[in-house]
Each structure stands twice: as structure tokens, then as C-alpha cells.
Amino acid sequence: MPATQSPLPSLAATLGATHKDLSTARLYEEAIRRGEAVIAADGPLVVRTGKHTGRSPSDKFLVDEQGSHDDVWWGGFNRPISEQRYERLRARMVAHMAERDVFVQDCFVGAHLDYRRSVRAFTETAWASIFCQNLFRRPKAAERATFSPDFTILDAPSFRAEPERDGTASSTVILVHLSRQEILIGGTEYAGEMKKGAFGIMNFRLPDEGVLPMHASVNIGRDGGVAIFFGLSGTGKTTL
């Protein structure tokens, strides 16, 4: 199924105060100045993510649209939302962000040059932009000159969905449009939703290229043997 480029990258042109690809040091200063974070011993930033200290799977929906409908295993985890509701929510979320400072970060998801994808993240907070720098891979200077995002993330934690109007489970909402390769996040400050959304699109796309995505870590023994460790988050894969 071919993907269509998200129209969200042009959002930056419509916003008044847009901070594009700031350095970590500048973002650090902005996070402190704006009261988003405090400095802990030895200098790391500490933030509070409110009521959401982890992902909120019950608030996540995939857009049920023609381009991806037959390729999704619909059910309890992959829950559908109509394209009409998505468009209405998207318009309100974009309008919400247009009234705020927005931090824009261009990154790559994946290390392999043949399989990585480019992502542009629009975040409401400076610290979330640092999160993107740390979690994803930053382009080199030469790559920035020709950077074009394959998919887009819009992270608006202060946005609130209206369940009766929007068909959501709560005021928190995470929407993924697989054909447009857009991820919209509202009502949660937990930055891991950006990671999971990006990985979800990669997991959807890469099998068509003959690549098996795995939630795993790999270790190589002295004799060159390879061991793959599978497990849920926090089960010690990286430690092993």
C-alpha cells in the first residue's frame, strides 16, 4: 500500500512563533525558562507528565480509511476511528497549536540508511523536542539541507478531545493515519506516545520491504554467535 506524504509539514509556515531544530542547549534553556522542567543534581532535566505516567492504549485509534483498511488487523488493540472524525479533530488540534509556541524537530527513525524514515515532530513543549533528539537520530548538517519528512508527529498535550463529540474514550487522544503517515497526540504529556506512534508506522511499513521489525535486543558472544532477546518494555532486554 503506497503512503501519501502528510500535509502537516507545511504547518510550520502558518505558525507565528516556531522554533526549528534548536540545539539541545537552547531547548534546555527554553524548558527551564518556560517552567516545563526543573534541574536535578548533576544537571539533568526533570519533568512531570501529569496523570499519564505511561502510554494510554485505550485512547489510541487508527483511522479507518481506504488506503490501509484491508491491511490492519482490527480488534481490541487496533481500534478504528472514522476519517471524518479524524479530520475534525485534526483541524481543531492544528488551530489549537497555531495559538502557541511550537518546537519543530527533524529526525530519522532507524539507523540503517536503506530502511530509516524521516520524521518531523511538532511539539508544544521544549522538553518534548529534546526527547525527540534523544530517542530518534538527528540529521547531519548536509542532510538537513534536503530533509523532507516521510511522516509527521503533532504533539499537543494541552489539547482536550470531547468524547461525546469526537467519539474518543476520554479527553486524551492518540490518532494514527497510516496512509498519510500522521500521528496526532492530545491530552497527554507522556512523550513515549511519540515513540510508540513512530515505531508503529515503521512496523506497518517495513514488512512490505522484506524487513521483520522486532521488539528485541541483540547480543553477540565471543564465538560470534548471536542471541536475540524478546520481551515487553522494562524486562531487561538491553541489560542482557
Give the location of each predicted region:
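Glycine-rich phosphate-binding P-loop
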Residues: 220-240
